[in-house]
Amino acid sequence: MTLRPMSERKPPRTKLCGSRRTALTLFGLIASLIACHAASSLRVTAFSRDGVLAWTNAPVPGICTIQAASAPNGPWTPRQNTFATNSTGALTVPMAGGNCFHRMQAVAVPPTPQGFTNLVYAYGILETIAGSGFGRLDDVSYWSPYFEGVPATWAALSRPHIAMADRAGNVYIADKNGHSVLRVAPDGTIHTHAGTHVGGFNGEGPAPATTLQLNYPNGLWTRSDGIVYVLDTDNGRVRRVNTNGIMTTLFLATSDGSAINVGRGLWVRADEALAYFCAGTKLRSWTPAGGLKTLASGFSELGDLYVEPGGDVIVGDRGANYAYRIHPNGSQTILAGNGTTNGGGDGFSALATGLYGVRSPWPVPTGGYLLLTHDGCQLWYLDTAGIIHLLLNGSELTHNGDGAFFYNPYVPKISEGRAVTMDYEGNLLICESDYGYIRRIRFQRIPPPE
């Protein structure tokens, strides 16, 4: 199912219900809250002096949007989105000085064509947040000391493989050929977070992370508090960088610390009692008591992974063109892909669709999944009914679309996809291109034309 480009249609809007209105004064700030969805049941239950807004009867799964205006008749500007995974919820609304009116709207995101439309138009601008695209050669580091502290889009990345954010808004990048983990701060500047930019091994730590060498780091996992775990592939280790910038070795990822065979993807539980990573044809697990084990094997070329709350592991097998669900007992089922590079497509069954080099899965709070393909250069959304939808198209060596609405499946905008994640605000982070870019799709509606 293909949607028309933004220029040809207006974003879907929910009906406003005047009966769902609450007005209160907070230190001279007048807030008008209008809330409803198709069932006319969404209701704001509280709006505190510090800007915490609470509601009930939201559609599930759904997306709630706060809009703001300087007058009760608008014009209204989308201010903030949040996914509704429960019928009740709350968020903090940024409070501005003077009179400001707010209203709340919600749309449902069921596994239907309209649900996909509602999801698409909750997102907005595509942008590059890191990478200048200077070079694309493998086994070459393009890092320069000049890049330290400059805007991240001025820095040349060196085959980055994943970008993941903490709750404070820092984005951490495993810059494989730069032998480092880079951090994009909330102000958009880039900094070395771990590694020396020279591949090798010079100790386990504890030591400042920027004094210890990494060797082709291919994966990372970031906790909400800013602790970062690194798959130090050619050093055969998983490293831990704490919030004070001190790096240690959490565990050896091979029996003797030799290089991991095609190491990709990493997940570490918050209590550090369980970890998973991919090693070529195997999904490996680690526990402090049991050490390393193979949970599942027989794959072609595993990529990234995500572990669900129930314990299932979602992985992409780039070589086999399948995404799998692997259960805690090691059994597996195909989640998406037909095992070839073509067939099916937008609006078809995910199991009938060729996902060329599917590499990276990530869950969406709707219950669906994002699936990013390396060779196909595409970002897909898999809904809970098993139907797949094309979110972002691409082609080899393409870098296009910055500053505009992200959705137009007819226009290539990305190239070789390596990882997709979602930050704590709902923005999508896409690590793509041999030239090395980190792209972001903002979870922010585009204001409708006045």
Name each region found by the language model.
Residues T65, H179-R183, G236-R240, T281-R284, ...:
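A short loop-to-beta-strand structural motif that recurs across blades of beta-propeller domains
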Residues N170-Y172, I227-Y229, L274-F277, D312-I314, ...:
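Conserved beta-propeller blade signature
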Residues A165-A168, T222-D225, V268-E272, V307-G310, ...:
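Residue-level detector of Asp-centered blade-edge/turn motifs that repeat once per structural unit
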Residues E416-E450:
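Blade-level signature of beta-propeller repeat domains, shared across WD40, Kelch, NHL, RCC1
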Residues C36-N118:
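Short, composition-biased motifs enriched in small/polar/acidic residues
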Residues G115-R159, T189-Y216, G245-G265, A289-G303, ...:
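Gly/Pro-rich loop segments of beta-rich domains
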Residues A23-I34:
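Bacterial N-terminal signal peptides
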Residues K176, T233-D234, C278-G280, R318, ...:
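Short loop/turn segments immediately following the C-termini of beta-strands
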